[in-house]
Amino acid sequence: MNKAAFQSQHNVNISGGTSNMKYFVSAGLFTQGGMFKQFNATDDFNFDYKRYNYRANLDFDVTKTTLLSVNIGGRIETKRTPESGEDQNQLFRKLYWAVPFAGAGIVNGERVVSNSEVLPFTGVDGLSSYYGKGFQTKTTNVLNVDLALNQKLDFITKGLSVKLKGAYNSEYANTKKASSSKAYYTPVANADGSISLRKYGTDSQLSYGEPDNGFSKARNWYMELALNYARKFGDHNVTALLSLIHI
């Protein structure tokens, strides 16, 4: 593993407005690299994470008694992980279980493991659970939108107002798996005392799963109607709230 991985975060915020409108806009980018060394692998199986987030808040004074608020936010994220056929906890657990006599690692661009015909117990090297096995990429798209209309009803009675709020939330995720295999070698002692490498397995190109592999989606609606009354009579504050909520 590498001693360090690159991480970056960037944000841009803009705010302003006029006498009848106020706005706030934000955009951000967060990236995080992986700790695994690639060695001579042609396909990048390392951990990688990218997230793009955005938000826009708009407030409109439609009239002196009417306020309209529009809020839009969301994020798009892509996460790549090594494809080992196991969960990530098991993947890192095998790194801890790796023993120094399990193999020589990467030698002249090839993965070399100990020969079980020579050693009674070879253990497992740290590369066995992920090296050359491909990767999986999960893309998630989250959207949150809410609208709020606040209308003062002082023409009926002072302190009376009505608020109508609606929200829409959605999340779509798609996981694509790319599998491959990579040959490994074991050292063999020849009769003349030299050492040769015996090959096991083959090198195969990436094979992607079905386009809809791991697809999921979810969405929900939220509606709220609230009648609010707040008024002060001398030293006394009187408040009342009637709310209807539909989810």
Q: What do the predicted segments below correspond to?
A:
Residues 1, 30-40, 119-131, 197-209:
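Flexible, solvent-exposed coil segments and beta strand-coil junctions
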Residues 3-28, 32-35, 45-124, 136-140, ...:
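Flexible loop and strand-edge segments within Gram-negative outer membrane beta-barrel domains
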Residues 25, 70, 147, 162-166, ...:
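Membrane-embedded beta-strand positions of outer-membrane beta-barrel proteins
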Residues 39-44, 57, 130-136, 148-150, ...:
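Extracellular loop and loop/strand-boundary signature of outer-membrane beta-barrel proteins
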Residues 41-45, 85-96, 178-188, 194-195, ...:
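Flexible, surface-exposed loop regions and adjacent strand-edge segments
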Residues 245-247:
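Conserved small/polar residues in nucleotide/adenosyl-binding loops
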